[in-house]
Amino acid sequence: MFVDKARIFVKSGDGGDGAVSFRREKYIPLGGPDGGDGGEGGDVILVVDPNMTTLLDFKYKRKYVSERGQNGQGAKCYGRDGKDLYIKVPMGTIIRDVETDKIMADLAHKDDKFVIVKGGRGGKGNVKFCTPTRQAPNFAQPGMPGEERWISLELKLLADVGLIGFPNVGKSTLLSVASKARPKIANYHFTTITPNLGVVDVSGISSFVMADIPGIIEGASEGVGLGFEFLRHIERTRLLVHVVDISGSEGRDPLEDFLKINEELKKYNIKLWDRPQIVAANKADMVYDDDQFNKFREELNKLGYKNVFKISAATRMGVEDLLKECARVLSTIPVTDMEIPEEERFVPEDKHFTYTIRKEGDTYIVEGTFVDRLLASVNVNEPDSFRYFHKVLRNKGVMAELEEMGIKDGDMVRLNDFEFEFLK
């Protein structure tokens, strides 16, 4: 089964908690604190597997969580870091953040990998909180929670050449004779309902990947037929082979077919319309008058399309010349990565921890990323830890800012769900 879209939940490992521990040994009366730090949480990393061609695996498993960091221990023993979780994806996978619908990464090469969520930082053990005036801290820092998010995976096939054209014009037959691919072939519309890939070996010249793209009909850019479900697979191709039924066996005019398909490409993505095209006038074995082909070629020449081949995929007439021309044209087109527009690019959350203060009645509310991080790293119910919490607020300038705003003794200060009474 070919699956080219998936949505999964990823969560990195939480950091391990720092340890509260004191050295207790015979004949050592002043052992002091010796709590070790917690380990780092494991990352979740997407990595390209060249052997994968579909996102089918994600149809059955949608939740991926990496390992938590181990807690610190006494004797200054650090916790073990959590193991990173590697998720294999096919080459050509685009990763989007579901919440913003922005593109986070485009994994288009064999060795590409991307850290989708980073593990939480391990908490510090109580030995790290020793000062000349606080020689036996009775608190440690909890580990930071790991990141989590829903992401969507979107596969855009990596092919050098894309076969486009109306249904039943012979695209699948052409792919089957040009490569070892074995797509379903029958004499009815939409025989092909998923893209098919084949490696074409042009003897003595080169080899390239060809894709049979189904579902392009009039209105496809607006969702008609199979719609734009498969139009996106053309985006990575460097060259398009536009297959038309020159025999008009279904009562359609080949020139009109050609113009309609190009109009759909233009509506979907203007860059596709500008992509180099070779025209394959297929089913020529059913045409007994060369004037029909010559007239078609003349009209295309007027429109600027010079590469027009008369072929029959069924009898293989003209197919070899067509493939040689594909190889020649490809050699003149550089391989480039897909550009991600600035407005579609995911912007990571600002790692600079900031805060704002506002007043509601007699309560001063402090909020922001600085507050979230601070509360996650202390235990406000433990006296030593609360004093450390108060010191951080003062060193950060929060207390001074509150005083400038006119706070008085007895007023309440709220940080998220935690409140305390202000005293100078």
UniProtKB/Swiss-Prot annotation:
The record ties this protein, via CDD domains, to:
Obg (cd01898)
Main location group = cytoplasm
InterPro entries linked to this entry: G_OBG (IPR031167), GTP-bd (IPR006073), GTP-bd_Obg/CgtA (IPR014100), GTP-bd_prot_GTP1/OBG_C_sf (IPR036346), GTP1-OBG_CS (IPR006074), GTP1_OBG_dom (IPR006169), GTP1_OBG_dom_sf (IPR036726), OBG_GTPase (IPR045086)
UniProt binding sites for Mg(2+): S172, T192
Q: Name one Pfam family in it.
A: DUF1967
* Residue ranges constituting the OCT domain according to the UniProt record: 345-424
From the Swiss-Prot or TrEMBL record, state where the protein is found: Cytoplasm
The Obg domain extends over 1-158
Cofactors named for this entry: Mg(2+)
| Gene Ontology CC annotation, any one | cytoplasm
Molecular function terms from GO: GTP binding; GTPase activity; magnesium ion binding
Domain OBG-type G span(s) in chain numbering: 159-331
Q: Which Gene3D superfamilies match?
A: GTP-binding protein OBG, C-terminal domain, GTP1/OBG domain, P-loop containing nucleotide triphosphate hydrolases
Q: Which domain of life is it from?
A: Bacteria
* The family this protein is said to belong to: Belongs to the TRAFAC class OBG-HflX-like GTPase superfamily. OBG GTPase family.
Sum up the protein's function in the record's words: An essential GTPase which binds GTP, GDP and possibly (p)ppGpp with moderate affinity, with high nucleotide exchange rates and a fairly low GTP hydrolysis rate. Plays a role in control of the cell cycle, stress response, ribosome biogenesis and in those bacteria that undergo differentiation, in morphogenesis control.
Q: What is this protein called?
A: GTPase Obg
Identify the species of origin.
Answer: Clostridium acetobutylicum (strain ATCC 824 / DSM 792 / JCM 1419 / IAM 19013 / LMG 5710 / NBRC 13948 / NRRL B-527 / VKM B-1787 / 2291 / W)
Q: What is the lineage of its organism?
A: Bacteria, Bacillati, Bacillota, Clostridia, Eubacteriales
